[in-house]
Regions:
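Substrate-binding/active-site clefts of carbohydrate-active enzymes
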Residues: 1-70, 75-104, 121-122
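Conserved alpha/beta catalytic core and glycan-binding cleft of carbohydrate-active enzymes
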Residues: 91, 95-204
Length: 204
């Protein structure tokens, strides 16, 4: 399937989930409890990326998809839900490993984040190959603002987009609609970083 897409000039990305294992039918805690911490997520126990073997598990999985199946890129689901102290080092380590693969094979490999924290510092669409950064972020701000404008729904995280037209304009001009302002959905906690210096290609 991927070869057929490539023959037609199409890239193929795979959506991968490294922020949690399934909450039901997941027996990994019984056989490998070191994979988890005492922290909890909406999807079960938090993954213990401070453990070297656990980090290697995720990185090797990413490389497997990219090297053996020749996917052109990965979209990392909800990385803001990775529960580790400070900046999740797994993100940088994974990007560096993928960058090494891209350099070794001469391929263009793309890494895209879903990150509700709007972390501009981890994005660098110009780095070739990517080694420590990510080419782009799934920009939910733009979608959420349009959703509120078109449907009127403003509950939950949509609460932050009640001024939808202004958020749409800011997303088009600067990328993120939230760049460090207090978020009502997060009970006044600041959300996001300045993103106006990034090109449009950094936002999907």
């Amino acid at each position: 399937l991927i070869d057929a897409a490539h023959q037609r000039g199409l890239m193929v990305f795979l959506d991968v989930v490294y922020n949690h294992f399934g909450p039901e039918g997941n027996y990994l805690p019984r056989i490998a409890p070191q994979f988890f911490t005492d922290a909890h997520t909406p999807w079960g126990g938090a993954i213990n990326y401070e453990n070297e073997n656990v980090r290697a598990f995720a990185i090797d999985n990413a490389l497997h998809w990219l090297d053996h199946y020749r996917f052109d890129g990965l979209r990392l689901d909800a990385v803001h839900a990775i529960v580790t102290p400070g900046e999740p080092e797994i993100l940088q380590a994974l990007s560096q490993a993928v960058g090494d693969l891209a350099k070794r094979t001469g391929r263009h490999i793309h890494l895209v984040l879903e990150n509700d924290d709007n972390r501009a510092a981890v994005l660098d669409p110009h780095e070739e190959p990517p080694a420590g950064h990510y080419r782009a972020q799934w920009n939910d701000d733009y979608h959420h603002a349009w959703h509120v404008l078109m449907t009127g729904e403003d509950a939950g995280y949509y609460r932050d987009y009640q001024d939808a037209p202004a958020r749409i304009v800011r997303s088009l001009r600067e990328g993120f609609a939230w760049q460090g302002e207090p978020s009502s959905n997060r009970k006044g906690k600041a959300r996001g970083e300045q993103s106006g210096h990034l090109p449009p290609t950094a936002f999907v």
